[in-house]
Amino acid sequence: MVTQPAAFQPGDLVWLEFADVSGREQAGRRPAVVVSAGGYNARSSLILVCPVTSSGKPWPFKVKLAGETGGVDGYALVDQVRAIDPNARHARKAGEVSGACLADIRARLAVVLGLPPEA
């Protein structure tokens, strides 16, 4: 079990490098929203993130980021959630999304994963 010195929290907006991608996956240095639980992040060498795109094309699994996102404007791609190593990808915190934005991301992620909605 690995303990990260400063674990990322759900809703953190981080900049990182998306490499080794194929097809329609997002690539390059870009922001992403952390969706994994803080306790998991503190004990694992991985975090789960949704990459962010600037493209506003309509899609039910895109969530518009709120204004308090550290100056990042865009959409979280909920259907492209992935596990990444924040150290290997040089992740840096840039800000946080609002509680309402994180709740919207989690609700759409539950649909993608076939999980029951939160009560």
Residue ranges and their predicted role:
Residues M1-A119:
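Conserved functional hotspots at enzyme active or ligand-binding sites that engage polyanionic ligands
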